[in-house]
Amino acid sequence: MEYMILIHSDESYEAPTPGTPEFEEFMGAFLAYNQSLIDGGHWISAANLQPSMTATTVRKSFGAASTVVDGPYAESKEQLGGYYVVSAADLDEVIALVEALPIPMASFEIRPIAFRPDAG
């Protein structure tokens, strides 16, 4: 079964600066984690999102014109920062994958994928 892991984190957290040893260690942990997903047959896709200040929200209502506003849908300290789509036997396996993610502080929302048009 396929699952989406939504990663919500505090945007005030500052990741290590590119070019520093801390950044290399930080990125190395993610590359190793991603490779472990690939090697384990779990990898489908993943992406890191731009900060919420770059978001645009479009609200639609039946019979009414759409409303377009700058910013995320919800104003919150924790914002959607990225996601993974993984293949796993069950929810327990996905939880184990999330627990291995090299992110020190975040909330992870796991949702089963009902349908993906490009799935084989």
Per-region residue spans from a language model:
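Conserved, structured core segments of small domains
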Residues: 1-120
